[in-house]
């Protein structure tokens, strides 16, 4: 142990004396007696155990049930607690957040701090958790060696006692705090006590957009090391220019007593051995004594050494092919006997920025990334391996190759799993000061320098051996100050093998190797003062800008969102220096809570009585809290797919397939193709898809099509499926797809239904109140006053619970609401524009209603105007045509005042009395899709249960639309035309009124929305209007047609 690391226990002051110092309000005090950062240690005592990653008996988990007492402030904790548990103590699981176990409340905020902003001071009422745990050590742990305790994550600051004696203090919630317990331990029972503070000055550096919770939320473990032991290991790989050979570079430092550290004869008696294994094969091995080459005029290091092992033709690590070796680093004594060994998974890979491109192993990589918070709806920020694996497998299955640890270092196991399964990682320091004014305030304050620097340097020291980490990040949304420049230089000096990114200060400062904006748009400038966000196509062409551009956050997936995502990917593929980005974000950060009836529901900001709060802004995920996919996850999967397709010729039918894989052959994929007419296959085939990386190949599907007769469009569908299962996917997993509408000339189309009839089955009846059309067992009744079709009777039973009428509104999306809330109105938000224009308060008036009898049909014409504040805003004309087959065709023409903003929709709605189990349609599906989010949807014949037509967004909104539909069948109802539709047990009005999904109640019958036109959902961000111009409804005139029939009456 070095002199700096030695712990000399002194008489322990009383708890009240320690707390009197208020270390948690001093930014220059971040720890007492905490050991230096290093990669995870396990101290194996057998080489084969280290090689095989066998659980080490030298590391013991202390997870489980701990004793817990809660206080509203630290000063209320009695001094005697450090010696023994208090009578009111309860059992608390570790790891966990105490707010999820009945103590205190979770608080959700985005930008604003949850406490008054007065750094470094925090509230006097500072919730405090007092934990204790008893354990018994192995006798040999007491006799010799060093016993450490490791806290992988404690929020936000804590003091530690062992057997009544004070050990130390630490803050930084997201990196390990490790202490030497050796001087405090005894034979038999030992008791540790941990006092955890909810708020500390460190909380000002942890203003991330997440739930603010407290406690010991990651693993706690004991580690036993020999007296002489490995204290740091740094592993890096260096590849030759042609990648045919490599060097494994290992720096190992040893803890040696101070008296011996400058005695070369003593230190050279110890040797470091490095073995490189590939499965059970020893690839390379090297052994050498401690000691380095001279460093400067004062000599060399005696307590460390540097080893370099040459490897010929190494397997290269990438997210596509995560080839891992096992490096075992051993400390040997003078007799060549093993003292201890540490071991790490190692990947040979090179990360470099060359000619403006981020390259992995010499290839420019396209980042298919997502931001991920550590979040679980039941356990909060305590994440286990099962949850981590679930996320990784889902990401891989949906064509993600990268993840940004937003916005803090993750649990150590996360990186091992990313190494193993193959994900590129941006490792981000636990720094965010978003609520500061200005954000850079603390980054320019010298008193906060050590607090900033430890969060960056300790992250690098812990995680730098992982091949999955390709980029370091200095943190998030903390402005750009002198501290950032200093820490950028420190990383570049200490780890020149990886680039550094940092978005603060405008995304293109001197503290970043990558231009990494958040929410910059493809073609639209956002000229904010001081930190403009240029259109990304423009940004890479700015003078003196030669860096790659990778969006650190984009495509804000809040609720029903993600419109325009495909535009980003068109740009990424078109401009080489636009190298992708990280979607915001992975999972809806909702917590499970029980309602007054004991039923669980997903809660968001404010549901726990937390104030301040930012409502549902915590729910921006591609997946629900339980990891069920949002529809937008499929859009991401399709846009990011590794195979691209183009149609070369239709006669013969030839397609071209391009592989975007950089390193792997597509030798586990089959391509399936199918020609469909009205959703039914008329010709299909398949063949192996064995493409080299970055290669393109043409495939001839068929020389000619068979004679095809029938109504509808002809579609060519292709999809790529994996043949064998992989570590992250089952066999037959679909990884890419596309479709084309084939020219009509390839199909012989049958004629539609004829209007001719041999008998007249239609009757028209008019009186002062109604107009009624009758056809056999059904009749339609119009109200003369309202002009609306208010009854559609079949066999004497009315099938309409509400009249069929115009529909111009939708239950507002999060993107429609923007930042508006009761106390803060954003006049630019769509919902506020609609309110101001009176769209929600339109008064309908019927101008005319009249009927005409034609030779084979009855025609009814109705005109309506919609007014607000005595101003006419909309004029609609409905032309109903009833034919001899009992069909009702409606032609709708809508005229819109030029003063109105874009409407949410132009369509019709009604409440049907029927409830059927399934919905069938010919159009885009199977999942929800919208005009600006339909790349992943395919045109075919689909069938789904009614309940699955509703997307259960936690904050209810417009949902469930299916676009470009030509046929809809719901029980006896059948509609044809060209329209979008949504069908649900919930009305638009109920969706607008409900604050949570679990509050929705199924209504009578079924609500049916038929849209001729629907505005896009947007999604570049959620706080400014982001629907692109071509997806707005800004025309003055809209027209559409729908044909209805009730089939069992014909």
From Swiss-Prot:
<dbReference type="InterPro" id="IPR036156">
    <property type="entry name" value="Beta-gal/glucu_dom_sf"/>
</dbReference>
<dbReference type="InterPro" id="IPR017853">
    <property type="entry name" value="Glycoside_hydrolase_SF"/>
</dbReference>
<feature type="binding site">
    <location>
        <position position="620"/>
    </location>
    <ligand>
        <name>substrate</name>
    </ligand>
</feature>
<feature type="binding site">
    <location>
        <position position="1023"/>
    </location>
    <ligand>
        <name>substrate</name>
    </ligand>
</feature>
<dbReference type="InterPro" id="IPR050347">
    <property type="entry name" value="Bact_Beta-galactosidase"/>
</dbReference>
<protein>
    <recommendedName>
        <fullName>Beta-galactosidase</fullName>
        <ecNumber>3.2.1.23</ecNumber>
    </recommendedName>
</protein>
<feature type="binding site">
    <location>
        <position position="209"/>
    </location>
    <ligand>
        <name>substrate</name>
    </ligand>
</feature>
<dbReference type="GO" id="GO:0005990">
    <property type="term" value="P:lactose catabolic process"/>
</dbReference>
<feature type="binding site">
    <location>
        <begin position="553"/>
        <end position="556"/>
    </location>
    <ligand>
        <name>substrate</name>
    </ligand>
</feature>
<keyword id="KW-0378">Hydrolase</keyword>
<keyword id="KW-0479">Metal-binding</keyword>
<feature type="binding site">
    <location>
        <position position="432"/>
    </location>
    <ligand>
        <name>Mg(2+) 1</name>
    </ligand>
</feature>
<comment type="subunit">
    <text>Homotetramer.</text>
</comment>
<dbReference type="Pfam" id="PF16353">
    <property type="entry name" value="LacZ_4"/>
</dbReference>
<dbReference type="GO" id="GO:0000287">
    <property type="term" value="F:magnesium ion binding"/>
</dbReference>
<dbReference type="GO" id="GO:0030246">
    <property type="term" value="F:carbohydrate binding"/>
</dbReference>
<feature type="binding site">
    <location>
        <position position="110"/>
    </location>
    <ligand>
        <name>substrate</name>
    </ligand>
</feature>
<comment type="similarity">
    <text>Belongs to the glycosyl hydrolase 2 family.</text>
</comment>
<dbReference type="InterPro" id="IPR006103">
    <property type="entry name" value="Glyco_hydro_2_cat"/>
</dbReference>
<keyword id="KW-0460">Magnesium</keyword>
<dbReference type="InterPro" id="IPR014718">
    <property type="entry name" value="GH-type_carb-bd"/>
</dbReference>
<dbReference type="Pfam" id="PF00703">
    <property type="entry name" value="Glyco_hydro_2"/>
</dbReference>
<feature type="active site" description="Nucleophile">
    <location>
        <position position="553"/>
    </location>
</feature>
<feature type="binding site">
    <location>
        <position position="477"/>
    </location>
    <ligand>
        <name>substrate</name>
    </ligand>
</feature>
<dbReference type="InterPro" id="IPR032312">
    <property type="entry name" value="LacZ_4"/>
</dbReference>
<dbReference type="GO" id="GO:0009341">
    <property type="term" value="C:beta-galactosidase complex"/>
</dbReference>
<dbReference type="InterPro" id="IPR023933">
    <property type="entry name" value="Glyco_hydro_2_beta_Galsidase"/>
</dbReference>
<dbReference type="InterPro" id="IPR008979">
    <property type="entry name" value="Galactose-bd-like_sf"/>
</dbReference>
<feature type="binding site">
    <location>
        <position position="209"/>
    </location>
    <ligand>
        <name>Na(+)</name>
    </ligand>
</feature>
<feature type="binding site">
    <location>
        <position position="620"/>
    </location>
    <ligand>
        <name>Na(+)</name>
    </ligand>
</feature>
<feature type="site" description="Transition state stabilizer">
    <location>
        <position position="373"/>
    </location>
</feature>
<feature type="binding site">
    <location>
        <position position="477"/>
    </location>
    <ligand>
        <name>Mg(2+) 1</name>
    </ligand>
</feature>
<feature type="binding site">
    <location>
        <position position="434"/>
    </location>
    <ligand>
        <name>Mg(2+) 1</name>
    </ligand>
</feature>
<dbReference type="Pfam" id="PF02929">
    <property type="entry name" value="Bgal_small_N"/>
</dbReference>
<dbReference type="InterPro" id="IPR006104">
    <property type="entry name" value="Glyco_hydro_2_N"/>
</dbReference>
<keyword id="KW-0915">Sodium</keyword>
<feature type="site" description="Transition state stabilizer">
    <location>
        <position position="407"/>
    </location>
</feature>
<feature type="binding site">
    <location>
        <position position="617"/>
    </location>
    <ligand>
        <name>Na(+)</name>
    </ligand>
</feature>
<dbReference type="Pfam" id="PF02836">
    <property type="entry name" value="Glyco_hydro_2_C"/>
</dbReference>
<feature type="binding site">
    <location>
        <position position="613"/>
    </location>
    <ligand>
        <name>Mg(2+) 2</name>
    </ligand>
</feature>
<dbReference type="InterPro" id="IPR004199">
    <property type="entry name" value="B-gal_small/dom_5"/>
</dbReference>
<dbReference type="InterPro" id="IPR006102">
    <property type="entry name" value="Glyco_hydro_2_Ig-like"/>
</dbReference>
């Amino acid at each position: 142990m070095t002199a700096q690391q030695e712990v000399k226990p002194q008489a322990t002051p009383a708890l009240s004396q320690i707390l009197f110092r208020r270390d948690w309000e001093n930014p220059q005090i971040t720890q007492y007696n905490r050991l230096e950062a290093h990669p995870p240690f396990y101290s194996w005592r057998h080489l084969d155990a280290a090689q095989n990653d066998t659980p080490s008996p030298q590391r013991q988990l202390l997870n489980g049930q701990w004793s817990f007492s809660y206080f509203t402030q630290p000063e209320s904790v009695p001094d005697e607690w450090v010696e023994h548990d208090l009578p009111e103590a309860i059992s608390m699981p570790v790891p966990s957040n105490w707010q999820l176990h009945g103590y205190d409340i979770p608080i959700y905020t985005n930008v604003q701090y949850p406490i008054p902003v007065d750094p470094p001071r925090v509230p006097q009422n500072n919730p405090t958790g007092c934990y204790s745990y008893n354990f018994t050590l192995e006798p040999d742990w007491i006799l010799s060696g060093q016993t450490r305790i490791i806290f992988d994550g404690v929020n936000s600051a804590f003091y530690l006692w062992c057997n009544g004696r004070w050990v130390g203090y630490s803050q930084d919630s997201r990196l390990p705090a490790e202490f030497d317990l050796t001087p405090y331990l005894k034979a038999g029972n030992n008791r540790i006590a941990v006092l955890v503070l909810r708020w500390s000055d460190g909380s000002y550096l942890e203003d991330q957009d997440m739930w603010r919770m407290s406690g010991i939320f990651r693993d706690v473990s004991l580690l036993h090391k020999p007296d002489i032991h490995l204290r740091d290991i740094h592993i890096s790989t260096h590849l030759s220019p042609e990648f045919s050979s490599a060097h494994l570079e290992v720096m190992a430092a040893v803890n040696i007593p101070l008296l011996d550290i400058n005695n070369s004869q003593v230190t050279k008696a110890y040797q470091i051995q490095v073995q490189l294994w590939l499965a059970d094969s020893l690839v390379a091995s090297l052994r050498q004594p401690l000691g380095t080459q001279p460093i400067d005029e004062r000599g060399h290091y005696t307590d460390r050494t540097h080893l370099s092992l040459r490897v010929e033709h190494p397997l290269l690590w990438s997210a596509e092919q995560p080839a891992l070796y096992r490096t075992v680093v051993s400390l040997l004594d003078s007799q060549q006997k093993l003292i201890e060994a540490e071991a790490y998974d190692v990947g040979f890979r090179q990360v470099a920025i060359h000619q403006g491109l981020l390259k992995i192993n010499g290839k420019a990589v396209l980042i298919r990334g997502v931001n991920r918070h550590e979040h679980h709806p039941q356990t909060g920020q305590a994440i286990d391996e099962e949850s981590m694996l679930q996320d990784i497998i889902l990401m891989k299955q949906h064509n993600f190759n990268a993840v940004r640890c937003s916005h803090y270092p993750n649990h150590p196991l996360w990186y091992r799993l990313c190494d193993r399964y193959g994900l590129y990682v941006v490792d981000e320091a636990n720094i965010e000061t978003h609520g500061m004014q200005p954000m850079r305030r603390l980054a320019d304050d010298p008193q906060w320098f050590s607090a900033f620097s430890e969060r960056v340097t300790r992250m690098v020291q812990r995680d730098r051996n992982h091949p999955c980490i390709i980029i370091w990040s200095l943190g998030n949304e903390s402005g750009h100050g002198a501290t950032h420049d200093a820490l950028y230089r420190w990383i570049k000096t200490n780890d020149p093998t990886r680039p550094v990114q940092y978005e603060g200060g405008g995304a293109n400062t001197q503290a970043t190797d990558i231009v990494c904006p958040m929410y910059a748009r493809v073609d639209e400038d956002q000229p904010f003062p001081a930190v403009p966000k240029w259109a990304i196509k423009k940004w890479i062409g700015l003078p003196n800008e030669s860096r790659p551009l990778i969006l650190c956050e984009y495509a804000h997936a809040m609720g029903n969102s993600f419109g325009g995502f495909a535009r980003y990917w068109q740009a990424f593929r078109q401009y080489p220096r636009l190298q992708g980005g990280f979607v915001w974000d992975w999972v809806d950060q909702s917590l499970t809570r029980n309602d007054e009836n004991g039923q669980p529901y997903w809660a968001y900001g404010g549901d726990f009585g937390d104030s301040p709060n930012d409502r549902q802004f915590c729910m921006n995920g591609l997946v629900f809290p339980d990891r069920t996919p949002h529809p937008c996850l499929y859009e991401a999967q399709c846009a990011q797919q590794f195979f691209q397709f183009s149609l070369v010729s239709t006669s013969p039918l030839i397609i071209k397939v391009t592989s975007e894989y950089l390193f792997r052959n597509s030798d586990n994929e089959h391509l399936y193709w199918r020609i469909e007419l009205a959703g039914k296959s008329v010709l299909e085939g398949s063949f192996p898809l064995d493409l080299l990386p970055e290669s393109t190949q043409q495939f001839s599907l068929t020389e000619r099509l068979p004679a095809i007769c029938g109504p509808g469009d002809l579609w060519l569908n292709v999809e790529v499926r994996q043949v064998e299962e992989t570590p992250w996917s089952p066999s037959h997993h679909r990884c890419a797809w596309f479709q084309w509408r084939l020219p009509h000339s390839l199909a012989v189309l049958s004629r539609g239904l004829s209007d001719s009839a041999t008998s007249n089955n239609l009757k028209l009846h008019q009186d002062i109140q109604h107009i009624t059309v009758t056809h056999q067992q059904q009749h339609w009744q119009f109200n003369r006053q309202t002009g609306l079709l208010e009854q559609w009777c079949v066999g004497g039973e009315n099938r309409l619970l509400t009249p069929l009428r115009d529909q111009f509104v939708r239950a507002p999306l999060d993107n429609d609401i923007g930042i508006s809330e009761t106390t803060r109105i954003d006049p630019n938000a769509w919902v506020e524009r609609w309110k101001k224009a009176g769209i929600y308060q339109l008064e309908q008036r019927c101008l005319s209603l009249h009927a005409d009898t034609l030779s084979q049909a009855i025609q009814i014409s109705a005109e309506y105007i919609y007014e607000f504040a005595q101003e006419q805003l909309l004029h609609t004309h409905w032309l109903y045509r009833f034919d001899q087959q009992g069909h009702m065709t409606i032609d709708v023409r809508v005229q819109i005042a030029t003063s109105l903003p874009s409407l949410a929709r132009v369509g019709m709605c009604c409440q049907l009395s029927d409830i059927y189990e399934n919905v069938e349609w010919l159009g885009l599906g199977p999942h929800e899709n919208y005009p600006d989010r339909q790349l992943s949807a395919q045109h075919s014949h689909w069938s789904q249960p009614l309940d699955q037509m509703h997307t259960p967004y936690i904050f209810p909104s417009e949902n469930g639309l299916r676009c470009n539909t030509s046929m809809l069948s719901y029980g006896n109802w059948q509609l044809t035309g060209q329209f979008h539709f949504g069908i649900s047990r919930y009305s638009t009005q109920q969706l607008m009124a409900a604050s949570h999904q679990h509050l929705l109640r199924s209504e009578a019958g079924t609500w049916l929305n038929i849209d001729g036109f629907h505005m896009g959902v947007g999604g570049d961000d959620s706080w400014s209007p982001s629907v692109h111009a071509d997806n707005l409804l800004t025309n003055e005139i809209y027209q559409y047609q729908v044909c209805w029939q009730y089939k069992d009456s014909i």
